[in-house]
Design a protein with these regions (language model features):
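Thiol/selenol-based redox catalytic cores and closely related redox-interacting motifs
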Residues: 33-116
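Local sequence-structure signature of Cys/Sec-based thiol-disulfide redox active-site neighborhoods
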Residues: 1-22, 26-31
Length: 116
């Protein structure tokens, strides 16, 4: 299982703590040092069944400075995926990718129902 996170993010820290406390093994990946690629994001989006907007870090400074709230509705899905792949700080975190699931953000109840 792959955990894509930003170490300074308090939500990511909580997620890692939850995984550790529950004895769930994962491989850690720093979202800025190795941001998700276009191909990865496209695959994970398809597997997740979630709307693509859920992959955006809507509370992030980068999202707000680019005024993406207004721009995203006019962009194609392909353009949005390419944009996400340009900067890890645009991506909602943590991202957890398993063989048959993708989690966007930390939701302990959702994680527990799949991982325990």
């Amino acid at each position: 299982m792959l955990l894509i996170e930003y170490p300074k993010c308090s939500t990511c820290q909580k997620a890692k703590c939850w995984l550790d406390e529950n004895g769930i093994a994962y491989t850690d990946r720093h979202i800025l040092e190795q941001p998700p690629t276009y191909e990865e994001l496209k695959e994970w989006h398809a597997r997740s069944g979630l709307p693509l907007r859920r992959f955006f870090n809507t509370s992030g400074l980068k999202y707000k400075s680019l005024a993406l709230k207004d721009k995203l509705p006019t962009m194609t899905e392909d353009e949005q995926l390419h944009l996400l792949a340009t900067d890890g700080m645009l991506v909602k975190r943590p991202l957890v990718v398993g063989d048959d699931f993708v989690f966007v953000g930390f939701k302990p109840d959702e994680w527990a129902s799949t991982l325990k």
